[in-house]
Amino acid sequence: MDTKSQTSFQEKALELLIADADKIARLIRVQMDHLTMPQCPLYEEVLDTQMFGLSREIDFAVKLGLIEREKGKEILDSLEKELSVLHDAYTDK
């Protein structure tokens, strides 16, 4: 595989991972906008499943050499910070 193709695959992989992370971030923001609702176990289960799936996608991309492990960690850390804000906002209410 030539360098140009490899770079293209790496860019596409990163775009897809960031798009999936953005979907999860939207789920988090929706929940933050509706904090008046009681805590929803189904919502939490969906969010946990999405986060786990994204972590598996990132591990796969790292193993293929499409992204650096540190970049994958940054993506997950960003989402975990948003989840922490959601948790803090909910428990402080």
Curated annotation (Swiss-Prot):
Pfam family, one: DUF1507
Taxonomic superkingdom: Bacteria
Alphabetized Gene3D superfamilies for the sequence: SO2669-like
Lineage, broadest ranks: Bacteria, Bacillati, Bacillota, Bacilli, Bacillales
UniProt-recorded name of the protein: UPF0358 protein Bsph_1390
Family stated for the protein in its record: Belongs to the UPF0358 family.
InterPro entries assigned: UPF0358, UPF0358_sf
